[in-house]
């Protein structure tokens, strides 16, 4: 069927992935981060730094950029995991839910690459805790 051809195109299949990781590269570069950065939109829309009024996520992006930079420079010891041309690590950040008063500690995962030097990008997303088993 002709109308199904669009689903076979590579660009159409990747559009959902592109929408799930918002490009915050200009903001990260203002904080001195050297790579392109993409952060899960749920993280930016739901959380902010503790005791900071941050409507657009500017300070949250800056804090994440500083943490990732500290891990790469060795100032924040973390175990780096190789994913082929990419390296990844987990880290924690203290944030506050936009609609709650209590601070929370979130577990985030960052993957940086490709490590061959072309168009480096850092991808950051929230690690969801496992849900309770249904039984």
Q: Which residues fall in each region the model found?
A:
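N-terminal "domain-start" segment
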Residues: 1-63
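Functional cores of ribonucleases/endoribonucleases
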Residues: 51-134
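Intrinsically disordered, low-complexity and often Lys/Arg-enriched segments
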Residues: 1, 134-135
């Amino acid at each position: 069927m002709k109308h199904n051809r669009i689903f076979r195109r590579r660009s159409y299949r990747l559009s959902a992935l592109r929408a799930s990781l918002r490009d915050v590269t200009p903001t990260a570069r203002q904080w001195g981060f050297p790579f392109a950065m993409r952060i899960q939109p749920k993280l930016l829309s739901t959380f902010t730094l503790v005791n900071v009024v941050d409507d657009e996520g500017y300070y949250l992006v800056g804090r994440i950029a500083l943490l990732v930079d500290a891990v790469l420079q060795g100032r924040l010891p973390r175990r780096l995991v190789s994913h082929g041309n990419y390296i990844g690590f987990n880290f924690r950040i203290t944030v506050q839910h936009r609609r709650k008063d209590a601070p929370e500690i979130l577990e985030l995962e960052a993957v940086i690459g490709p490590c061959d030097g072309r168009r480096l990008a850092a991808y950051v997303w929230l690690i969801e805790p496992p849900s309770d088993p249904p039984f």
